[in-house]
Amino acid sequence: MSDQQLDCALDLMRRLPPQQIEKNLSDLIDLVPSLCEDLLSSVDQPLKIARDKVVGKDYLLCDYNRDGDSYRSPWSNKYDPPLEDGAMPSARLRKLEVEANNAFDQYRDLYFEGGVSSVYLWDLDHGFAGVILIKKAGDGSKKIKGCWDSIHVVEVQEKSSGRTAHYKLTSTVMLWLQTNKSGSGTMNLGGSLTRQMEKDETVSDCSPHIANIGRLVEDMENKIRSTLNEIYFGKTKDIVNGLRSVQTFADKSKQEALKNDLVEALKRKQQC
């Protein structure tokens, strides 16, 4: 029964507005306390922003940079609140983490023109793993609010030759928009999308891990953006257009009659 309850709960969370995930998740846990651990580990939540007081830069909070009640900043590598024995990446991986944060900071600035990004890496037996986080919230200008949260978890298995690596990327994007205009009223639109991909890439000075991961993330975000734009927003536009027409009924009737006349004329021409 618990498996069925979990499936139903996850299916419900996928259909509810992303901007209300925390409240809805809390309500579900109150209803079925036994699902608490499974839900918290399975449901991606909107990213929260913290300030690194050491370097004066913002960073994003998630389970991957948390140890107990403290969170590690990717900029200073310090925990807040301070934690003496908190989990840390190896020296080699920390160097890669610093480079990755600088690279994705530029990526975020180019693609999103603002927002906050963070990259966290940790060691594995045969390689390493990491998470790339990006958050861009609308400022509410032009009566439009919204937020984009993307979470990219990548696992890197380094081959024994050291010249190639296997990359496994799992990406989740949570997006919501809200418009409030006097002519059309308030409209909410939001959802989340998760996609996976795996790929083998060459590792060299010309194509290091950061460049390979960057290309994978860029390609995945472009695909997700395209899917959201063409399928979700496109479908919503079709539905709205079907419900509400800018044409008068008389104009629409004339257009339909003209279309029927053209069809009949083409049929007669083909018969001749």
From Swiss-Prot:
Major subcellular location class: cytoplasm
Location of N-acetylserine modifications: 2
Keyword vocabulary terms for this entry: Acetylation, Actin capping, Actin-binding, Cytoplasm, Cytoskeleton, Phosphoprotein
Modified residues annotated as Phosphoserine in this record: 2
GO cellular component entries: actin cytoskeleton; brush border; cortical cytoskeleton; cytoskeleton; cytosol; extracellular exosome; F-actin capping protein complex; hippocampal mossy fiber to CA3 synapse
Localization per Swiss-Prot or TrEMBL: Cytoplasm, Cytoskeleton; Cytoplasm, Myofibril, Sarcomere
Membership in a protein family: Belongs to the F-actin-capping protein beta subunit family.
Name of protein: F-actin-capping protein subunit beta
Naturally occurring in which organism (per UniProt): Homo sapiens (Human)
Name of the gene encoding the protein in the UniProt record: CAPZB
